[in-house]
């Protein structure tokens, strides 16, 4: 295995690990505990399954922590293609990671309130709004990521195009959720297809790695 392919696989595996932690907090936990527009039922579920909810908080923190290493691995893989764009990806991660950690603190705050029922939806909605706001920054991560993949020649160009579309999709989701929340679910339904680009790149990196001969051909 070449050093380039090894770097790609490390990045892919870390990407998968971070995504798994994210799915636990953003998909699995809400499906088990959160009841839309029902603060009483949501509060009861959280109190009845406090360990599960706390596990979701830990998963969210781990997702954010592992993402730092994902970004560093991607930087190592792609800096030779375009260092300014690769640095921009690192800068965005440095900016966005503290936001995730602060957002996790909002979840912890639920357990500190005497009137949990009155505050639970407030903090969960605040968590969601911060997630939406942070998605505005993802376009500044995924568009450079997509451009680097497209130019690399050792990764499929279609993945580069797809990742650029992922960045645009995150931006549209963020703007819709913040300004037109009634349409958020509709936009999310269509955006899911585009966001599968992240699944595609992480699986390609982890399974296929990178083709170093393509890099050699492009620099000759």
Predicted segments — roles?
Residues 1-220:
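Hydrophobic, aromatic-enriched alpha-helical segments typical of multi-pass transmembrane helices
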């Amino acid at each position: 295995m070449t050093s380039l392919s090894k770097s790609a696989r490390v990045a892919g595996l870390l990407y998968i690990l971070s995504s798994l932690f994210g799915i636990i907090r953003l998909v699995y936990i809400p499906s088990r505990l959160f009841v839309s527009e029902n603060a009483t039922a949501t509060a009861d579920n959280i109190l009845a399954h406090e360990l599960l909810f706390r596990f979701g908080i830990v998963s969210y923190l781990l997702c954010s922590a592992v993402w730092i290493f994902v970004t560093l691995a991607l930087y190592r893989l792609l800096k030779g293609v375009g260092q300014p764009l690769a640095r921009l990806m690192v800068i965005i991660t440095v900016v966005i990671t503290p936001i995730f950690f602060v957002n996790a603190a909002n979840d912890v705050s639920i357990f500190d309130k005497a009137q949990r029922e009155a505050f639970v939806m407030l903090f969960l909605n605040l968590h969601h709004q911060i997630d939406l706001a942070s998605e505005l920054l993802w376009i500044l991560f995924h568009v450079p990521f997509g451009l680097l993949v497209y130019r690399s020649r050792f990764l499929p160009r279609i993945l580069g195009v797809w990742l650029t579309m992922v960045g645009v999709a995150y931006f549209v989701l963020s703007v819709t959720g913040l300004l037109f929340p009634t349409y958020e679910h509709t936009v999310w339904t269509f955006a899911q297809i585009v966001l599968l680009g992240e699944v595609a790149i992480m699986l390609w990196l982890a399974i296929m790695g990178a083709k170093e001969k393509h890099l050699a051909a492009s620099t000759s």
